[in-house]
C-alpha cells in the first residue's frame, strides 16, 4: 500500500500495554475505593504539576483563601445566598480607606493574621439617609394624664383609692381612664376598650371594680371577706402581664385587708393555687389555660358571684391560640346563674345586676372582632379620643404614643453586631442618669448568644443584694462588657425569654425593674406586651417584629404615661427598607446612618474582657476599630467552644425565625435576599453553619408487619398522603402570624 503521508501522534512507550479494568457490582463506595487502589498500584495517581509546566504558564493564579473561609476580596462566595441568587447591588468599596488598609495588611506576606473586612462588598442602600437632622421636638403626649382634670377624685371614686393612687405617684387620670371609669361606675353593659399602649388601661378597669366592691363594706366593713367569692376574673395573655396586673391590684387593696387577690398562671404549682382558691379570693388574675384547668378541676372555685370578666390584650389572646380556652371560660360563666346575695345572705345591690364583660385591645383585627362576638353583648365602644370612636372599626390601626421618637438605621448584615455594640456604648456613655434599655431579638437562642457575648466573663455572681431570688437570677443577670464607659462604669445585663422557667422569668423581670444602675434587658417578644417597667428610656429592635402590631407593642415599653422615649429599629439594605413606608403610616421615623453610630461609639477607648491578638489602638479610625472589634469577637469564639456553639445555634434559629413574618409583611423580609455568609458575621462566625431547614431525619426503611407485604399502589398512596400532610402543616406555619414559639 502506498504511503499516504499520514502521521500518527501516538507514543505508546516501550512498556507492555495494561488492560483497563472496569469495576462492576457492589456498593458505590466500594467501587470508588477499588478504582483508587488500582490507580495507586499502577502509578497513575495524579500529581501536582510543577509551576514550570509550559501549558499552565498562561493560567491566572487563583485568589488566596484566608483562614476565615473568605477570598481576599472580603466576599463570602461559598455562603452567598444559598436560598436564591446572589444580591445584585453591591458597593465595590463603600469605604475605600478601610478596605485598602486591610489589603495592605494582608499583602505584605509577613503576617498571616486574618483581617475581618466589614466595609466592602455590602449591599447598596436603596433609600437615602437623611443626614440633616436637627433636635427632635416631641409633640404633645397622647397617653399623658389629662391637664383639665383636677384629680381622680373628680371621677367619684373612693377617697381611700385616691390616696393610694397618690402614694403611687398618680394624680390625674389619662384619656382612656376618663372614659372607662365613669362608664363602669354607672353602667352594667359590656364594653370594648380601645387605647394605645401605655395609656393606663389596667387602672381604667381596676378602679371602678374596686370602688363598687368597697361600697358593699361601707357600713362597718365586716360584710365582705376573702371567702365571699370572686367578684372579678381578669384574663391576661402572658404570665408576666398577669403578674403585673396582680401587683398593681395588690397595691390598690393594701388599705383593705379583708379583700384578697391572687394570680394563677402556668408554670406555678396547681396544688398551691388550689389551696389559695379554697381559702377564698375576691379578685382572680389568670392566664387562659390555667383558668380553664381550674374551672374543670377545682370545685372550690365558685363562679356565681363573678360580676366582671376582663379580657386584657384581646388581640394577643387570640394571636397566641387561646380561643378554645376562652370559649371554655365564657361558656362556663354563662352556664352559671348570677347570685344576688353572698353565701351568708348579704345582698349585692352595689354590684351590677348582670355579669359584665370588658374586652381591652389596641387593635380591631378580625380575630378580636370574633372574640367580641363570642364574649360581648350590646357592648359600648370606648376610646380615649372622640375621633377614635368615630373611626370605622375595619380601618382603625394601632399607633404608638406621639411623644415616642422612632428612628431606624439601615445596617449591612456584616456590620450589625459591631453597630449594636457601638450604639449601646455611646448611649450609656452620654447618659449621666440611671437609665434602662431593652433589646428585642427574634428567638431565644439568639438572646442566649448575645447575653453570653456581652456578659463580663470575669463576673461569677449577679451584682445584686443577697436574697432568696439571687440563685434564680444567677444565670440571667450579670455585669456587662464592651458597652461600659467612664460615665457608666457598670451596666447590669439581663436576659429573658419563654424557654426560662417561670420563677426565673419573674425574678429577672423584678431585678430589671428594681435595678438602680444603668441596665440592659435582652429579650424576645415575651416582654413586649403590657409590661409597665419604670424608667425605660430606650427600646432597640435588633430584629424586626414578626408583625407590625408586635412592633407597636415593643416600642410601647417606653414613652409610657406621657413620658418621652426613644426606639431604634435595625433594618437590612434591600427589601427590608420597604418596612419604612409601613412605619410612616403611624409615625414619622427618623433615619440614622450606621457610620454615625460607629463614629460615636468608637470615640472612647474599647476595652476587651478577654485578651486576644486583636488590640484596637486609639490612633486608628473608627473603621479600623470596628474591624478590630469584629476580629476580636471571632477569635474569642474560636477559643471558647461554649460560646461558639451558642453563636451557631443563635444563627440557625435566627434564619428559621426570619421566615415566620406575617403573610402581609413577608414581602419586606424575603429570605431569598438574605446573605447567609454576611449574617453569620453578625454572630461572630467566619462561615455560615450548615444544617438549616433540614427538618427531622427520616429513616429510609419503613417498618412493615412481618410476613405482610404492602401493595405497591397502596404504599405509593400512603406516601403521597404523608407528603400532603407535611405540605399542609408547612403552609399553615408559613401563613400564620407569629405564635408563642416565635417569642422564645
Swiss-Prot record:
It catalyses: ATP + H2O = ADP + phosphate + H(+). A motif (Q motif) lies at residues 150-178. Residues 182-382 form the Helicase ATP-binding domain. Its EC number is 3.6.4.13. Pfam families: CTE_SPB4, DEAD, Helicase_C. Residues 43-53 have a biased composition (Polar residues). Residues 27-38, 56-68, 706-721 have a biased composition (Basic and acidic residues). InterPro entries: DEAD/DEAH_box_helicase_dom (IPR011545), Helicase_ATP-bd (IPR014001), Helicase_C-like (IPR001650), P-loop_NTPase (IPR027417), SPB4-like_CTE (IPR025313). The keyword Hydrolase applies. One of its GO terms (biological process) is rRNA processing. SMART domains: DEXDc, DUF4217, HELICc. It is an enzyme of class 3 (hydrolase). A motif (DEAD box) lies at residues 312-315. Keywords: ATP-binding, Helicase, Hydrolase, Nucleotide-binding, Nucleus, Ribosome biogenesis, RNA-binding, rRNA processing. It comes from the Eukaryota. ATP-binding RNA helicase involved in the biogenesis of 60S ribosomal subunits and is required for the normal formation of 25S and 5.8S rRNAs. The Q motif is unique to and characteristic of the DEAD box family of RNA helicases and controls ATP binding and hydrolysis. Present with 1460 molecules/cell in log phase SD medium. This is ATP-dependent RNA helicase DBP7. The lineage of its organism: Eukaryota, Fungi, Dikarya, Ascomycota, Pezizomycotina. The gene is DBP7.
